[in-house]
A protein has these predicted regions:
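An alpha-beta-alpha
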Residues: 1-32, 142-156
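Short loop/turn motifs at secondary-structure junctions
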Residues: 2-5, 35, 65, 112
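Short acidic capping loops at alpha-helix termini that bridge into adjacent secondary structure
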Residues: 4-5, 36-40, 91-96
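Short beta-strand elements in bilobed, periplasmic/extracellular small-molecule ligand-binding domains
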Residues: 7-8, 26-50
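Conserved residues at the C-terminal ends of beta-strands
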Residues: 9-12, 42, 72, 101
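A generic short alpha-helical patch detector that favors 3-5-residue windows
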Residues: 17, 47-48, 72, 97
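Conserved donor sugar-nucleotide recognition element shared by glycan-biosynthetic enzymes
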Residues: 17-21, 48-52, 120
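Flexible loop/turn connectors
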Residues: 53-159
């Protein structure tokens, strides 16, 4: 939505999913010719929204030009809502928030969070298939990437 000042809130970078999401963020910046700004990247060490909010709030105070937040988990998305609200930033008007995962907290937030989701049924079936394959003699470890979907809700705006 034309944002150029996009911050990324990650969690536990040593988790593969967190690393992959971080790489996607960096790749998207490059693809859209947006320079990476290290001040727009933080890693929170907890899934606890209130603690995430403290770190996100500090980042927004130090970088008030940020117009969008991408959160690697829905719990950090809740922390982002708290931080923005405390700073008087209107979500969906002054700042956009997009989170990965959902829909656990989607119905509990105001405005509802825009989310990047994955086909859970497809992933579950693939996980079972991979587990069953592990019993075979010539098993080789494998990975599987599923195409994500963006579900746009009230937490984004056009710049």
């Amino acid at each position: 939505k034309n944002h150029k000042k996009i911050a990324y809130i990650n969690i536990f970078e040593n988790y593969n999913f967190a690393y992959q999401r971080q790489q996607g963020y960096l790749k998207s910046l490059k693809k859209n010719k947006i320079n990476y700004n290290k001040n727009y990247y933080i890693s929170v060490k907890t899934e606890e929204p209130h603690q995430s909010a403290v770190v996100i709030k500090k980042m927004l105070i130090n970088n008030p030009e940020i117009t969008a937040l991408i959160c690697s988990t829905e719990f950090s998305g809740v922390g982002a809502i708290k931080a923005c609200t405390e700073l008087g930033r209107k979500i969906g008007k002054d700042i956009s928030i997009v989170t990965f995962d959902g829909p656990v907290v989607e119905s509990l937030t105001s405005p509802p969070l825009t989310a990047i989701t994955h086909p859970r049924k497809e992933l579950g079936l693939k996980a079972i298939e991979m587990l069953l394959d592990m019993d075979k003699k010539n098993y080789k470890p494998q990975s599987y990437l599923a195409k994500p979907e963006i579900i746009e809700r009230g937490s984004v705006h056009i710049v």
